[in-house]
UniProtKB/Swiss-Prot annotation:
Keywords: Isomerase, Magnesium, Metal-binding, Phosphoprotein. The keyword Isomerase applies. This is Phosphoglucosamine mutase. The active site is at residue 102. The lineage of its organism: Bacteria, Pseudomonadati, Pseudomonadota, Gammaproteobacteria, Pasteurellales. Its EC number is 5.4.2.10. Catalyzes the conversion of glucosamine-6-phosphate to glucosamine-1-phosphate.
Length: 444
C-alpha cells in the first residue's frame, strides 16, 4: 500500500481551521473524490454530518468540489455514521461522505468516505483520490455540473431500519430507558427508535448547539447518565458518542456495562438462536474475562489491533459476523456494515426482553478483570521494548500471571510513550506488576 499523504486510518481528521480541515482543502477533496468516483458509474454522493458547527462549512465546500467534478450531492443533515453507511447502500449512491470527528471535542472535525456498499473505500480508490489532490483543479462544462439536493426523510428511513433489526415478537413496552445522545448525531434518532418500540424514554444530551457535542455526556463521559438512571429508577441507560458508532450501557444500579460485556451478551444470544456464524473478534485491549467467558461457551475468539477498522479486517478474513472494542464500537455484520450504536443497543435490549432479565443479570457473566494502564514517557531514539532488561522483567511478570492475567506493552504511534497494560483478577497484583514493568522501561 502506498504511503498516505492526506488520508489516515479513518479518513482525514484534525483541528478546524488548520490543514487539512479547512474549506479550501474540503473543496479540493470534494473535487478530487468526484473526479475519481465519476469514472465508477453513479453520479450521486451522499453527505452526512454530526452536529459540530463546522459541519455546515465543510459540507458546502465538499458539495462545491463534487459539483465542479460533475457529481451531485444529496445532503442528509445530522445523521449517525452508520446511518450514512446504510443510506449509501439503499440510495445506490456511488459513495457516502461523513463529516465527523466521532468522540472528539467540537473544534475537531474529520471527513471520511464509504463505498457504494457502505464499507471503507478500497485502498486503490483512496490512493487515486490522493493522487488527484495533487493535480490542478478544473471544472466540467456548465451543462455537466452537479446539483445539490436534500433527503428530507433520511432520519425516518434510518429509524425504520433500526426498528427492523429488533425481533417483531418482542416489545420494549414497560421499560424505562434513559438515552444519552452526546448532543451528537443520534439526538433525533435513538429516542424515537426506543419510543416507537414501546419504551418510556428519558432524554439527555439531545440539545445540540454546534459546540456541546461530547461535552460531559455520551459514551466517553457517562456520569450524568448513571445519575439519571438511578434517580429515575430506570431499567437501563444507553450512551452513544458524537457520531453514533459507539455504545456504552448503564444497568439499573448505575453500573457501567462496557463494550466487552455488550459483545458477550450479543454473542451468547446469537449462539442460543443459532445465528452466531463462527466466532467473535475483539482487540488487544479486550478484557481477559471476555475471552474466558466465550471459551466457556466454546465460542472462538480472535484479537485484532486496537481500532474498529482492524476488527472489521479480521472479521472479513475469518468470515465471522460479530466483533467490537471495549470502548463500545460493536460491529454486527448481519445488520450493518460498520459499528452501529443503536443497532447494538437493540441487540442487548432484545436479550433482556426475551429472557426477562435485567442488564445487570446479563452482564454478570463477564466480571471484568481490573486493568492497570501506565503511560511511560521515554527520551526517543531506541525503543525501550527492545531492551533485554525490559524483556526479562516482562517475561518474569508473565510467568507470575500465568493463567490468571496478561500483559500488553505497546509503543505509541504518535508520541514517545510506552503503554504498559496489566490485567489480572487480583487488582493489587496487576498494579504492582504494571509498576514493575514501568520502572524497567524508565531504566532503558
Amino acid at each position: 500500500m502506498a504511503e498516505r499523504k492526506y488520508f489516515g486510518t479513518d479518513g482525514v481528521r484534525g483541528k478546524v481551521g488548520q490543514f487539512p480541515i479547512t474549506p479550501d482543502f474540503a473543496l479540493k477533496l470534494g473535487w478530487a473524490a468526484g473526479k475519481v468516483l465519476a469514472t465508477q458509474g453513479s453520479k450521486q454522493v451522499l453527505i452526512g454530518k454530526d452536529t459540530r458547527i463546522s459541519g455546515y462549512m465543510l459540507e458546502s465546500a465538499l458539495e462545491a468540489g463534487l459539483a465542479a467534478a460533475g457529481l451531485s450531492a444529496a445532503f442528509t443533515g445530522p445523521m449517525p455514521t452508520p446511518a450514512i453507511a446504510y443510506l449509501t447502500r439503499t440510495f445506490r449512491a456511488e459513495a457516502g461522505i461523513v463529516i465527523s470527528a466521532s468522540h472528539n471535542p467540537y473544534d475537531d472535525n474529520g471527513i471520511k468516505f464509504f463505498s457504494a456498499i457502505g464499507e471503507k473505500l478500497p485502498d486503490e480508490v483512496e490512493e487515486a483520490i490522493e493522487a488527484m489532490l495533487d493535480q490542478p483543479m478544473d471544472c466540467v462544462e456548465s451543462a455537466e455540473l452537479g446539483r445539490a439536493s436534500r433527503i428530507n426523510d433520511a432520519a425516518g428511513r434510518y429509524i425504520e431500519f433500526c426498528k427492523s433489526t429488533f425481533p417483531s415478537h418482542l416489545s420494549l413496552d414497560g421499560y424505562k430507558i434513559v438515552v444519552d445522545c452526546a448532543n451528537g448525531a443520534t439526538y433525533h434518532i435513538a429516542p424515537n427508535v426506543m419510543r416507537e418500540l414501546g419504551a418510556e424514554v428519558i432524554e439527555i444530551g439531545t440539545h445540540p448547539n454546534g459546540l456541546n457535542i461530547n461535552e460531559k455526556c455520551g459514551a466517553t463521559d457517562i456520569k450524568a447518565l448513571q445519575q439519571v438512571v438511578v434517580e429515575a429508577g430506570a431499567d437501563v441507560g444507553l450512551a452513544y458518542d458524537g457520531d453514533g458508532d459507539r455504545l456504552i450501557m448503564v444497568d439499573h444500579l448505575g453500573n457501567k456495562v462496557d463494550g466487552d460485556q455488550i459483545l458477550f451478551i450479543i454473542a451468547r444470544e446469537a449462539l442460543c438462536s443459532g445465528k452466531l456464524h463462527g466466532g467473535v473478534v475483539g482487540t488487544l485491549m479486550s478484557n481477559m474475562s471476555l475471552e474466558l467467558a466465550l471459551k466457556e461457551l466454546a465460542i472462538p475468539f480472535a484479537r485484532a489491533n486496537v481500532g474498529d477498522r482492524y476488527v472489521l479486517e479480521v472479521l472479513k478474513e475469518k468470515g465471522w459476523k460479530l466483533g467490537g472494542e471495549n470502548s463500545g464500537h460493536i460491529i454486527v455484520l448481519d445488520k450493518n456494515t460498520t459499528g452501529d450504536g443503536i443497532v447494538a443497543s437493540l441487540e442487548v435490549l432484545a436479550a433482556m426482553a426475551s429472557h426477562k432479565l435485567s442488564l445487570n443479570d446479563l452482564a454478570k457473566a463477564v466480571p471484568l478483570f481490573p486493568q492497570v494502564l501506565i503511560n511511560v514517557r521515554f527520551a526517543g531514539g531506541a525503543n525501550p521494548l527492545d531492551s533485554e532488561d525490559v524483556k526479562a522483567v516482562a517475561k518474569a511478570v508473565e510467568q507470575r500471571l500465568a493463567g490468571k492475567g496478561r500483559i500488553l506493552l505497546r509503543k505509541s504511534g504518535t508520541e514517545p510513550l510506552i503503554r504498559v497494560m496489566v490485567e489480572c483478577e487480583d487488582g493489587a497484583l496487576a498494579q504492582s506488576c504494571a509498576e514493575e514493568i514501568s520502572e524497567a522501561v524508565k531504566r532503558n
